[in-house]
Amino acid sequence: MSDIGERVKKIVVEHLGVEPEKVVDAASFIDDLGADSLDTVELVMAFEEEFGCEIPDDAAETILTVGDATKFLEKNAKS
């Protein structure tokens, strides 16, 4: 897993309180990790803060899995 992937995983574990081994690329934030809509908004905000980038609403709606978040951030992260 890339450095960005590891950072995404850490944020997900901290925000959702899930076991690290459950946070895999294919894991859906809602279906697999138990997030609700507020959790997903908070995750997006945490990703923006951690990686120094803005995630537009239309892009945020396409980030449904851990892998989606990692791919987006690998392309758009500033730090």
Curated annotation (Swiss-Prot):
Transmembrane domains' residue ranges: none
List of residues that carry O-(pantetheine 4'-phosphoryl)serine: 37
A GO cellular-component term linked to this record: membrane
Stretch forming the signal peptide: none
UniProt-recorded Gene Ontology molecular function terms: acyl binding; acyl carrier activity; phosphopantetheine binding
Keyword Transferase: no
Keywords linked to the UniProt accession: Cytoplasm, Fatty acid biosynthesis, Fatty acid metabolism, Lipid biosynthesis, Lipid metabolism, Phosphopantetheine, Phosphoprotein
KW Lipid metabolism (keyword) present: yes
Subcellular location: Cytoplasm
Cross-referenced Gene3D superfamilies: ACP-like
Pathway(s) where this gene product acts: Lipid metabolism; fatty acid biosynthesis
Modification comment: 4'-phosphopantetheine is transferred from CoA to a specific serine of apo-ACP by AcpS. This modification is essential for activity because fatty acids are bound in thioester linkage to the sulfhydryl of the prosthetic group.
Chain ranges of the Carrier domain: 2-77
UniProt record, GO biological process: lipid A biosynthetic process
One Pfam family it belongs to: PP-binding
Functional summary from the UniProt entry: Carrier of the growing fatty acid chain in fatty acid biosynthesis.
PANTHER family: ACYL CARRIER PROTEIN (PTHR20863), CARRIER DOMAIN-CONTAINING PROTEIN (PTHR20863:SF76)
Family (UniProt): Belongs to the acyl carrier protein (ACP) family.
NCBIfam families in UniProt: acyl_carrier (TIGR00517), PRK00982.1-2 (NF002148), PRK00982.1-3 (NF002149), PRK00982.1-4 (NF002150), PRK00982.1-5 (NF002151)
Protein name per Swiss-Prot or TrEMBL: Acyl carrier protein
Lineage of origin: Bacteria, Pseudomonadati, Pseudomonadota, Alphaproteobacteria, Hyphomicrobiales
Encoding gene (name): acpP
